[in-house]
Amino acid sequence: MSERHRIGGSGLSAEVAVEGAELVSLRDASGDELLWQAGPEWPRHAPVLFPIVGRLAADTLRHDGQEYALTQHGFARDSTFRVTEESDDRIVLRLDDSASSRARFPFPFRLEMIYEADGETLTV
């Protein structure tokens, strides 16, 4: 199980995994779960899809005469993000390009996922 962080309190509370920066739980003030809780039908909750949504032809990105294997919905959902900021009601997770990512996606990037709970509102 991936490391998880909880934000929120008196209104909504949210739980975010560092693996994929995925929102894995969202509860209202009464404690009722509002988010799909992964099961055999679909093992995810709310995955971050980056750098693509959907599937490329033959799962291959072509750029400047080179081919890169890039599977459906990209790689962010299976990558470990780094927590760069955390408080009771806010968390920021970051994924930077690396040698591993450039083997699949030849562009520099910095992807930040920011989750902020304010009363009954979660902003992503």
Segments and roles (model prediction):
Residues 1-123:
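Surface-exposed acidic/polar loop and edge beta-strand patches at domain peripheries
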